[in-house]
Amino acid sequence: MRIIAGTARGTVIDAPLGRDTRPTLDRVRENVFNILQQQVRGARVLDLFSGSGAMAFEAVSRGAASAVLVDVDKKAHQVEEANCRKLRMDDRCRLLLMDWQAAVSQLQRADDCFNLVF
């Protein structure tokens, strides 16, 4: 799996092992971002059930201002952390290890708003 376009183009990222996570295929991600291209630059992204973080990292690579990645699976969270460091996106990505409902409640209380949600 790799980042398709933007500042991190071509960088290979890892996916959690096992059957608990099914990463979004490169070609699917490419098509989604081709459709959303005008909305990505400067956007604030929320990636629920983020797995490897591929959707959020792709968005940030293509110019999104920031991303919040949420996953309840500890293995997935560890892979996201490693991918985030590898991509040097620590300053633009926040990773939350928690249930999506708890994360959404926490983000609402903090008045966080998002332009794109995956």
Predicted features by range, described:
Residues M1-F118:
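Class I S-adenosyl-L-methionine-dependent methyltransferase catalytic core
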